Amino acid sequence: MDSEVQRDGRILDLIDDAWREDKLPYEDVAIPLNELPEPEQDNGGTTESVKEQEMKWTDLALQYLHENVPPIGN
């Protein structure tokens, strides 16, 4: 039947008891500040890092909007 899951036996070779019991260390990991999400979640609750937010502006080329403003008047 199409609605039943077909298990792939090859994955069983990758996962063993030692792998299941392996734990990550509880030590601190140094993360650059521009990779961290914004600390104030009052601004919309974004989970994007500062770097990701800056890239969004360059993806849309919005940083050039203020340079291409037509002159006011004649």
Curated annotation (Swiss-Prot):
Annotated stretches, region: Disordered: 33-53
Keyword set, alphabetical order: Cell cycle, Cell division, Mitosis, Nucleus, Ubl conjugation pathway
Subcellular location: Nucleus
Presence of keyword Cell division: yes
Gene Ontology BP term (one): protein K48-linked ubiquitination
Cellular component GO terms held in the UniProt record: anaphase-promoting complex
InterPro entries: Apc13
Record pathway: Protein modification; protein ubiquitination
Function: Component of the anaphase promoting complex/cyclosome (APC/C), a cell cycle-regulated E3 ubiquitin ligase that controls progression through mitosis and the G1 phase of the cell cycle. The APC/C complex acts by mediating ubiquitination and subsequent degradation of target proteins: it mainly mediates the formation of 'Lys-11'-linked polyubiquitin chains and, to a lower extent, the formation of 'Lys-48'- and 'Lys-63'-linked polyubiquitin chains. The APC/C complex catalyzes assembly of branched 'Lys-11'-/'Lys-48'-linked branched ubiquitin chains on target proteins.
Stated family: Belongs to the APC13 family.
Known partners and oligomeric status: The mammalian APC/C is composed at least of 14 distinct subunits ANAPC1, ANAPC2, CDC27/APC3, ANAPC4, ANAPC5, CDC16/APC6, ANAPC7, CDC23/APC8, ANAPC10, ANAPC11, CDC26/APC12, ANAPC13, ANAPC15 and ANAPC16 that assemble into a complex of at least 19 chains with a combined molecular mass of around 1.2 MDa; APC/C interacts with FZR1 and FBXO5.
Protein name in the entry: Anaphase-promoting complex subunit 13
